[in-house]
């Protein structure tokens, strides 16, 4: 098989390993007894696909209703679960309206009902309901700056949680029914609190942490945002629910797909083709252009010295690189930045082939 075709096949295998139609059904609970309701809610770039998997495998005679929010262009025609498209990675009014409707539905559940939450990457912006005193335009302004300053996604989400009525465990706190959150991870470490800003997860971060992040990256925040965070840090506003809070006794967060699962699937493709796969890890972080330079150095050493691995070899990794955006009109994202940096450093070295892509199909402002 030609190198280009092999790279594409490996990536397709990685995507298939996280395909909701294959991984969601095995995790679905039974319908509640005594006629209780099952409400499905979700947010993220995989929300529609996850909801479709639920519909396909839910008993036809059992009640099922719900609402999921996904990125523009990612919606699917569902029959029992409503699907709404909204803004990503910058939140918008449509997302706020949909989230308000979603929260109202969750609050209508009782102890005999059940909530299935479908959580995936991108949920932080799609599940947006600004806290009291915060306007959507304020949230947009802060989000845009955080996304372009080089902050890690974990840091960005700490700020988001403390400007939200639903993230950072607040969705779980608003629900009286048992909750099963099925989560597709897109973050290093696979911690549910960082995936879609953890709507059903305990939040160990604080208002003071959020303020420190804004200061660290010199974010020019609207007055309303600073006022809320400062009030929270002073104890004048309730914190997000923390680990050990009783609200999580009725909530299970279950990570059903991870970056490591996808890397393993990609590695199997190379093994079958007679290429030695080396998984470097699923937690690669740093500026994408700098990571590209490091990978170029490793690659050149292998090509020149056949060490520490003898070619043919495939270096496989995943993670959450960052990009500091200097031109707001720029295009692309971390994958294209990584590849460009890699290509420049390799300087047309022969026998080297590379692919970098996101399993969700989106690289920054562009499709893969």
Q: For each predicted feature, which ranges?
A:
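N-terminal glycine-/serine-/threonine-rich phosphate-binding loop
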Residues: 1-39, 48-61, 90-111, 257-261, ...
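Short beta-strand segments
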Residues: 41-42, 67-70, 117-121, 147, ...
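A glycine- and small-aliphatic-rich helix-loop capping segment at beta-alpha/alpha-beta transitions
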Residues: 53-63, 80-83, 107, 130-141, ...
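Glycine-rich oxoanion-binding loops at beta->alpha junctions
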Residues: 69-111, 154-155, 159-160
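Glycine-rich, mobile lid/loop segments that gate access to catalytic sites or pores
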Residues: 104-194, 199-202, 218
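Gly/Ser/Thr-rich active-site loops/lids in small-molecule metabolic enzymes
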Residues: 134-151, 203-218, 328-354
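Accessory alpha-helical/coil subdomains and C-terminal extensions
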Residues: 180, 202-294, 301
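Extended C-terminal subregions enriched in glycine
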Residues: 280, 289-293, 304-305, 311-312, ...
């Amino acid at each position: 098989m030609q190198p280009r075709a092999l790279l594409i096949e490996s990536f397709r295998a990685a995507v298939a390993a996280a395909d909701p139609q294959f991984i969601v059904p095995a995790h679905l609970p039974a319908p509640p007894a005594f006629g209780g309701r099952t409400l499905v809610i979700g947010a993220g770039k995989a929300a529609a696909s996850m909801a479709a998997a639920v519909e396909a495998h839910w008993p036809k005679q059992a009640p099922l209703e719900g609402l999921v929010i996904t990125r523009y262009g990612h919606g699917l025609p569902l029959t029992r679960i409503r699907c709404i498209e909204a803004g990503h990675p910058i939140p918008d009014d449509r997302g706020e309206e949909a989230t308000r409707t979603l929260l109202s539905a969750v609050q209508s559940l009782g102890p005999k009902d059940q909530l299935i939450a479908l959580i995936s990457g991108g949920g932080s912006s799609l599940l947006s309901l600004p806290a009291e005193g915060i306007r959507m335009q304020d949230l947009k302004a802060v989000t845009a700056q955080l996304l372009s300053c080089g902050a890690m996604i974990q840091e960005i989400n700490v700020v988001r949680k403390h400007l939200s009525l639903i993230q950072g465990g607040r969705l779980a706190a608003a629900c009286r029914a048992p909750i099963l959150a099925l989560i597709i991870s897109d973050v290093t470490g696979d911690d549910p609190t960082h995936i879609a800003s953890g709507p059903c997860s305990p939040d160990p971060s604080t208002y003071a942490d959020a303020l420190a992040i804004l200061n660290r990256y010199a974010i020019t925040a609207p007055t309303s945002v600073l006022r809320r965070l400062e009030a929270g840090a002073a104890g004048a506003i309730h914190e997000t629910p923390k680990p050990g809070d009783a609200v999580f006794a009725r909530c299970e967060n279950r990570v059903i797909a991870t970056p490591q699962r996808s890397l393993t699937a990609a590695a199997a493709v190379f093994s079958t083709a007679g290429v030695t796969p080396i998984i470097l890890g699923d937690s690669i972080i740093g500026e994408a252009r700098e990571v590209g330079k490091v990978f170029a150095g490793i690659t050149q050493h292998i090509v020149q010295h056949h060490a520490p691995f003898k070619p043919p070899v495939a270096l496989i990794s995943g993670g959450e690189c960052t990009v500091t955006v200097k031109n707001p009109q720029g295009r692309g994202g971390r994958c294209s930045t990584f590849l460009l940096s890699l290509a420049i450093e390799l300087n047309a070295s022969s026998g080297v082939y590379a692919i970098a892509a996101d399993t969700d199909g989106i690289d920054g402002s562009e499709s893969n």
